[in-house]
Regions:
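Short, polar/charged alpha-helical segment
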Residues: 30-54, 95
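Extracytoplasmic "Venus flytrap"/periplasmic binding protein-like
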Residues: 48-121, 155-156, 269-270, 288-291
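Extracytoplasmic/periplasmic substrate-recognition and gating elements
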Residues: 75, 249, 287-361
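Hinge/lid segment of periplasmic solute-binding proteins
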Residues: 88-145, 189-191, 292-303
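Short, solvent-exposed loop/beta-turn-alpha elements that line the ligand-binding surface or hinge
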Residues: 107-118, 162-166, 191-192, 197-199, ...
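Extracytoplasmic/periplasmic solute-binding protein
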Residues: 129-144, 171-228
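Glycine-centered hinge/linker elements that transmit conformational signals in sensory
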Residues: 174-181, 222-256, 298, 302
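Conserved C-terminal helix/tail region of periplasmic/extracytoplasmic solute-binding proteins
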Residues: 383-464
Length: 464
């Protein structure tokens, strides 16, 4: 990949005799920060030294801390640091800074050959206007996968005949979860309705947005920062029937901060979450002081709706280049293109379950021959993630005003209600009601309609 002479800009305006400094702010921590800093050092001692570019990188803590610091700089607040040349950002933050006139459009700096190297859906995330602009440079992405406590799954599968193929669709997943609840309930015949949940989800907004896309509906249709809402009644009812309903019945659950926490406590044995969460999957189930056992992990592609369209979520922050001198923008691109070349991008990405962003790098063969130490378990995770990227349309909503708050409604409206209503069902059963009596009001059409209208009204506030 050519590193000098970005796109149509022939004279970069920097050299060893006329050097340029580039500042980068990230939210990276731990191993990811160490990997990034090591690559920055490598760049500075090689390509940077040859071309007169010095990159200075600093971590600003969490994603929220970084967002706050960037906004303070953009607004010129007292005590704020000068704007960096590059910062890590998700689309909504990048859009807010773009509205303030702070973001460089990189489309003029990238040739057709440059663009063709990247997975197209990753580049389009930063095209806020739909005009072909590039205001977010992709650096590392993750995919959603289905993670299983393989040890306890094998006991269940041996007893019931359940297979991994049963988990390929969302409808199949719900059916398996029902069988798991009934199988565990039957183990204590003297105690009715004490079956255990099978499944949970880490990111409900992803389920709502991607599930709707699979069903032919784009909930947030954004253009030029304005959103048109398509909260299709039938599609949303399907989403409800395949999350809220099994949750009320005890087949799904969510109690810890993350679903990997629920696997650790034995609350569930499967969840859909980011490929980058693989490193947090527990190696033991510790249900209580008297019940603990070692487990292994299985990673599969995330289930999709039967007969639905092939959509999967694309997620992971990119790098945003701020407006500056032409030399600084071009130098920023030299670093970012070097960083996303397969050799370096694979080094940065794979240890933490992230994926390279180019067609060449996003190949399990390229990852395997990279020379990096890759455990069998991480190989399985990355194989499933690479297949997800290569076999689906990748989707994330375009940024729009209030997008973060609108997404939060999708994240919590159904899941919070499911948790509260399941708790009410359990309390009613503890008071002597049958499950049918305790759950009747929650499994009614009227319950869905009331929630649907409330959620629709909340989302309509973000239209236009």
């Amino acid at each position: 990949m050519l590193l000098a002479g970005c796109g149509s800009k022939a004279d970069p305006g920097f050299s060893p005799a006329n050097p340029v400094n580039i500042t980068i702010w990230t939210y990276y921590n731990g191993e990811q920060l160490e990997a990034f800093n090591a690559l920055v050092d490598e760049f500075n001692s090689t390509v940077g030294k040859e071309q007169g570019i010095t990159v200075e990188s600093s971590s600003h803590g969490s994603v929220t801390d970084l967002e706050n610091n960037v906004l303070a700089s953009a607004e010129g607040k007292v005590g704020a640091e000068a704007m960096p040349n590059i910062f890590s950002a998700y689309a909504d933050t990048a859009y807010a800074l773009d509205e303030m006139g702070q973001i460089a459009d990189l489309s003029d700096y990238l040739s057709e050959e440059d663009r063709a190297a990247f997975i197209e859906d990753y580049l389009s995330e930063g095209d806020f206007s739909g005009s072909g602009s590039i205001k977010i440079f992709p650096v590392a992405k993750s995919a959603e996968l289905l993670f299983l406590n393989e040890t306890d799954w094998e006991l269940f599968a041996a007893a019931t005949g359940a297979t991994y193929d049963d988990l390929a669709t969302i409808e199949g997943l719900v059916s398996v979860a029902e069988r798991y609840y009934e199988w565990t309930d039957a183990q204590t015949p003297d105690i009715p309705n004490d079956g255990r949940a099978f499944f949970g989800r880490d990111a409900m907004a992803n389920y709502m947005l991607i599930g709707a896309k699979q069903l032919g509906c784009t909930i947030f249709d954004a253009q030029d920062g304005s959103m048109t809402l398509n909260f299709d009644h039938d599609a949303v009812r399907t989403l409800w029937d395949n999350y809220y309903v099994p949750f009320i019945k005890g087949y799904f659950s969510a109690s810890g901060r993350f679903r990997s926490d629920d696997v650790k406590t034995g609350n569930i044995i499967a969840y859909v979450g980011s490929s980058s969460s693989a490193t947090f999957f527990p190696t033991q189930v510790i249900a209580d002081d008297m019940d603990s056992h070692d487990i292994t992990r299985k990673a599969l592609e995330s289930p999709k709706f039967a007969n639905g369209e092939d959509y999967a979520v694309q997620q992971g922050a990119g790098m945003v280049v701020t407006k500056a001198s032409d030399a600084e923008i071009q130098a920023s691109l030299v670093f970012l293109k070097w960083f996303t070349s397969p050799e370096h991008n694979i080094t940065f990405s794979v240890d933490s379950g992230y994926l390279p962003v180019t067609h060449e790098g996003n190949s399990i063969d390229a990852i395997r021959i990279s020379g990096l130490a890759l455990s069998d378990e991480m190989d399985e995770v990355l194989s499933a993630a690479v297949d997800t990227v290569n076999e689906n349309h990748l989707y994330t909503p375009r940024a729009f005003s209030g997008g973060t708050n609108a997404r939060a409604i999708l994240e919590y409206s159904m899941s919070d209600k499911a948790s509260a209503d399941r708790a009410a069902v359990k309390e009613a059963m503890a008071q002597g009601q049958s499950f049918e009596e305790a759950s009747a009001q929650f499994l009614s059409d009227e319950c869905f309609e009331a929630w649907y209208q409330d959620t629709l009204a909340s989302l309509e506030a973000f239209q236009g």
